Amino acid sequence: MEEGRRGDREGKSAAGWTALSTTKTTLEEKRRLQANGSVGGDAGTSGFRRIVRLFFACMVAGGIQYGWALQLSLLSPYSQTLGISHSYVSLTWICGPIAGFVVQPIVGYYSDRCTMKMGRRRPFILVGCLIICISVMIIGFSADIGRHLGDTKEHCSTYTGPRWSAAMVYIVGFWFLDFANNTVQGPARAMMADLSAGHHGPNVGQSIFSLWMAIGSVLGYLSGANGKWHEWFPWLKTAACCDACANLKGAFFTAVLLIVVSMTVTMYLADEMPLDKQDVDTSGGGGCAVFVDLFKSLRNLPPAMFKVLAVTAVTWLSWFPFIQYNTDWMGREIYHGEPQGTAAKADVYDAGVREGAMGLLFCSVALGVTSFVIPKLCRRLTSKVVWSISNFLVFALMAVMVAVGMVSMRGYRPSLAAGLTGPDPTLKAVALVVFALIGIPQAVLFSVPWAVASEVTAEEGGGQGLAIGVLNIAIVVPQLVIALTAGPIDGAFNKGNTPAFGIGGAFAFICGVLALIWLPKTRGVSNAAVVAGGH
């Protein structure tokens, strides 16, 4: 749900679970020998050429993140145009945490043991990217497919009712997209760790991975904010797919293009060393052994770790409403649009969604800048103080969003033509500032919890895999809770997104207090930890 949800999103996918499974020492020696030459093993290659090749070998991370940014910014609003009620949009996102919890560990287990000639990671990256391309095309053409499956034949410019066949096609594509994203993310990050060992070190590899994710996020949100796709490519519009839908198609077409190009570059430059069959660790009990080992390890966790898990869970309870409803809030509460209203109201809503995508771009920039100063802040203030401050900031920003939404909707009547003149400029500016500022605590969300968990488990003799594995449980469970309850709560109050944001703000305040009281004093945040939290 991401960065997360960017990305939301590595936080919920637990890319580091591959550390729970091991290979023999001979494999590690081969990997170091490979890295001591170059990415492809050429010992004569200059250091500059090695780092450039390593940089482009990770290009697939940018392509995947581009598509993920589109998913975060556009798909909740788009699903409502197909007839999925605002109260049940959250249920379409329930696959994300499930996929992150189940798919990534299993893919990590088998990618550690893959003996194909093309390497351990690239087969999974290839298959995952192909499924992503198919999934986004299913989503983009869901309205057209639904029309052929029995939805209304009335033109989309006049029809305002539900299109259930299209909605079902959309959900299938959405869920496949979530599973495919998790298939690619773990092996791609693990491959960077493999290729950067030796000359460069894991921090360099993970920093490159993070940079590509940032590039993908910025380009993805720019694409989502663009409302000209239907003008540049008029053939995207059909009787079932009007301007907003055509813009979604255009954005996803570019996603397919970028994913194919970035995947091709990665497949060519990431010259992995094949794993010999005799080097495969066969002592485990298959992919399910990952879960068995994880839950067994819970019994041996240090007491401080349970407090870290509790604070992490409450933190994610506060974040998921924003991750899910950000652009919808801009389209509804600020722009006064309706996804299933008249053509004019739908256009206003679409304009608000695109403005929200621009706000998420500002959020990504703030996140990237903040990530560089987090290690220094943690060393100066301790990690728990930084974590606590970030939660109080989320509380303040959620409160502002609730207040701005209520002021914007005060006296508003959907039947009034004044609602079509656009949002209040001051309120729109405040909303964009909130979107930008929320990138600051989001940088903490994607780094500090992982660093604290790693330090606590390391003090007790645990490893990174243990830390990330158990922390993933504390991330998945609250996401499931919010996904199951946020929409129905909004529907019960009939207040749009305001109740979810209010609840999120309350959890953020509680978590700010708990972080100060419960968390141990730690100060270290490595570069790898900064990008481990995901998107």
Curated annotation (Swiss-Prot):
Its main location: membrane. It is a multi-pass membrane protein. GO terms for biological process: maltose transport; sucrose metabolic process; sucrose transport. Homodimer. The keyword Cell cycle does not apply. Pfam families: MFS_1. GO terms for molecular function: arbutin transmembrane transporter activity; maltose:proton symporter activity; salicin transmembrane transporter activity; sucrose:proton symporter activity. Optimum pH is 5. The chain crosses the membrane at residues 54-74, 88-108, 123-143, 164-184, 204-224, 250-270, 303-323, 355-375, 385-405, 430-450, 466-486, 499-519. This is Sucrose transport protein SUT5. Widely expressed. Highest expression in sink leaves and lowest in germinating seeds.
